[in-house]
Amino acid sequence: MSDIYARQLEALRARSLDRHLREISSPSGAIVDLEGKRLINFSSNDYLGLANDPQLREAATKAIAEFGIGAGASRLISGTQSPHVRLETALAKWKETEAALCFSSGYAAALGTIPALVGKNDVIILDKLCHASLIDGAKLSGATLRIFPHNHLGKLKSHLEWARQKNSAARIVIITESVFSMDGDRAPLPEIVKLKMDFGAQLFLDEAHAVGVIGRNGRGLAFEENLSQEVDVQMGTLSKALGVSGGYICGSRNMTEWLINRARSFIFSTAPPPALAAAAKAAVDFLLSIGGEKRRQRLWRNIDILAEELSIQPASAIVPWIIGDEKETLAAAQNLQDNGFLVPAIRYPTVAKGAARLRFTLSAAHEATQLRSLAAAIKRLPKRDRTKPIRRLRSARGRPVAEQRTGH
């Protein structure tokens, strides 16, 4: 049996597609220790620098003292502890929905929620670049699945017309992300909402890379566009801008009650540690504070700095730098690491074949000098590796008013 895996691994190595784990021996932050070397970290999704924040650490420490380490059971048995309830109450208030439900991860949230809400007589229409968790959840549901090219409104409309003609009474669910994880661009949400309403569909929106970054108090793209009430299911994560771990679903109380009864990844998983729930609650509280708004504005200031240095227009804290060839992408990542920067080489199957890239993620924890040093290092890359990045313009509405350049 092991020989089979050895051959398969060798085949991956031959195509520069093998992956391995690298041990970080320091807390998550703008600077990390990797294999004995200090590196400026441009690989983390810790957009607000909260993963090692003193307020979150204190909240977790207090919860450990009061509730211990583990929950000891699934949520439906005896694993629902006060920190879980407080977190879900805070999430619902923050997202202005009736209720919220937390899962052990964002992947678990998608994998449990989509099959619980959608079945074999329904139709799912999904953006081609959606996260693997959304694709897997859609496949697991048994619904008819139609995929439209990335952000292609014409194809989305065609699929909606087909679905409605096929069965006028069918439940149709559009699934998309608000900010896409590999390209960093935004969904055309106003247009998608209009199509949703025109065809009587529902909208499932994954705000994983938008919450904490975009919208009033970091509530996400739906809030920036004043469309949150038109989103039927709001999904998000606690592990990126909020700096902790886990996923959540926000929506109607009836929907979350249904998920408690039918979402298998929720029912059959041990509850997240109460300390993580307490830390996530502290992160939500921080986002609603003046300090949280200042932290977001600092992040956008950092995005502006790199944008100016590289003459790009990022729509989020994710900046892709397309190279194409896997070997050249790995070489570029190693070049940057040799110069003191930790940047991931993203390859197939995470992205399409021929679309290998460097993926820079920015944080409020970065200093201006670190960003300018990164830009200089990118410009020094061998010519074959200096491919232009994806230039995804911001939506017409741009950032929230408080985040315009004049506010920095």
Language-model regions: role of each:
Residues I4-I69, A201:
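N-terminal "arm"/small-domain region of PLP-dependent enzymes with the aminotransferase-like
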Residues R146, H150-L205:
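Active-site phosphate-binding strand-loop segment of PLP-dependent enzymes
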Residues T237, A241-Q313:
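PLP-dependent aminotransferase class I/II
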Residues P54, E58-K62, E66, K93, ...:
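PLP-dependent enzyme catalytic core of the Aspartate aminotransferase-like
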Residues E58, K62-G106:
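Conserved N-terminal alpha-helix of the aminotransferase class I/II PLP-enzyme fold
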Residues L50, R295-G340, T350, G354-A355, ...:
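Conserved PLP-binding catalytic core of the aspartate aminotransferase-like
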